[in-house]
Amino acid sequence: MTASSARTLKGPRRFVRRVAHRANSPQWQFLRGFLKNPVMVGSVIPSSKVLIDKMLGPVRWDEVKLFVEYGPGVGTFTRPVLARLPADAKLIAIDTNPDFIDYLSKDIDDERLIAVAGSAADVQKIIEAHGFGHADYILSGLPFSTLPPGVGDSIGEATAKAIRLGGAFLVYQFSPKVRDFIAPYFERIERGFEWINVPPATLFWAWREPEAQAAE
């Protein structure tokens, strides 16, 4: 092979490597997931570190045995949760998009992570299938306001039943309407807002109060 021929081949090879690298990047995987099913992905841009820290702030990590995440996507929240999670705890990440689940399973090497292709409405069945009775905390970025009719209510009710007393449902949204889906099932709801995110997000911490045990 001549020197000129070798130089001619290097260009296409570099291009192929760049395309392959880009196709495997979290940003590209996230965009693919959004385009594939925008109704189930809240935003085309992953959450900011500021939002993540604020959302996870109230969690009592030393008490966590099981943390559940709805709609993990490419792991924008999954990795920070694992960084805070006790060594003997588990994180169950549930997503309806099998591409995201496959990506997480391959990209994150952590035995505490259990990535499940499924619906958040089936959270109780999923956690029981992995040997748990309740979750301590459940996190969601699912776009409740654009979910099919009835799905948001089903998820809100199922989530409240799956969380232990004293635990919480952590929700970050771009529409405050999510409160309508969770208020009927939680005893106390705190609300916050984060401007340093694209787009700015409303945050909710919906708590299961211990006094609710008598009512149950």
At which residue positions do the language-model features occur?
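S-adenosyl-L-methionine
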Residues: 101-132
